Amino acid sequence: MMALGVAMIIVDATIVNVAIPSIIRDLNLSLIDAEWVTTIYSLVFAAFLITLGRIGDASGRKRLLLAGLVVFVISSMLAGRAPNGGLLIGARLLQGFGGAMMLPATLSIVNATFRGRERAIAFGIWGSVIGGMAAVGPLLGGWLTTAHSWRWAFYINLPIGIVAFAGVTAFVTESRDEHGRPGFDLPGFLTSSIGLVGVVFALIEGSRYGWVEPTRLFTIGSWEWPLASLSPVAPAFAVGVTSLIAFYMIERRRSHAGRVVLFDFGLFGLGSFRYGNLAASIVSLGELGMLFILPLFLQAVLGYSAFRTGVVLLPLAIGAFMGGPTAAHFANRYGPRRVVTAGMGLEAIAIASIGVLLSLIHI
């Protein structure tokens, strides 16, 4: 049931990309509005992920997951019924917030529910769902857009969300961080949210609006960026980095004082945590980066349809679904370090091979 919630989050991050041309035609969107339909989801998701995860640890992870499912389903319905770009962007904002509620809740519930070998298998399934559904998203979006309407790319979340809500209610046990300190880290929340929004915005929009000198006008609704000689990306990035540095200093000071923190940076003192996150980041950059670029190349350069593009990406989903449980089995037998090393090597070979093949096809 939790896998269904994770699946909705990941699918919605990728399904819209192949539906955007149809959305632009149907709602008569400007290119700027279309860009915000995809961007706002990632911005809100990144901004609230840490904070909402901490709230779930304190108030109840199952409760947060159920609330996130409700928000996500309602916002999906609003997105599907949106009569104009403004309401669609607002619905996508709510979707990002709902996703930020669900993802940390599912991860914490898995960690609290399973032990030993079962935990490794559960995390393997959790990871395979993320990797697999990231590839299924374009296929599902292409089929729904081609066979029905782009609105069904959002409506599909309604039955899935209802089934997930019923399953979580019936089968998932409530859990909390019993050893957590009481209170809420407001300074940490503000600095982390501002920092993540600023940095993520800059990374997403830097190539579009220019990092320093503006290459196009930045607008939100009727509001226009007032500085003609400076892109909004540079100030956003500077504010984001400054806020994240402040977040680090605030969290370290609060931790030393014995006060509640949003994130314990002392965890990076553990080699397994530090290098595990580094490995996960490298894998995500490779897989998710390819999932963003490859559909654009297939459709814009090779002339593939949205559905055919999804079919090309389907083997990635199959491999991800099979790889999660298999990796858990091999990790128990040979040790996680060898499995991670082998997996990263396979991914490097695969991505390099795809790059060579695409260059030959393009020639």
Where are these regions (language model features)?
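Transmembrane-helix bundle of Major Facilitator Superfamily
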Residues: 1-171, 323-327, 333-334, 338, ...
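Transmembrane core module of solute transporters
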Residues: 1-45, 49, 149, 226-236, ...
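Hydrophobic alpha-helical interface/terminus motif in multipass membrane transporters
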Residues: 20-23, 110, 144, 172, ...
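Residue-level signal for the membrane-embedded core of alpha-helical transmembrane segments
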Residues: 47, 101, 194-197, 289
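Acidic-residue sensor for enzyme active/binding pockets
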Residues: 57, 99, 174, 205, ...
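Juxtamembrane/interfacial segments around transmembrane helices
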Residues: 126, 146, 186, 211-215, ...
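Hydrophobic transmembrane-helix bundles of small-molecule transporters
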Residues: 146-278
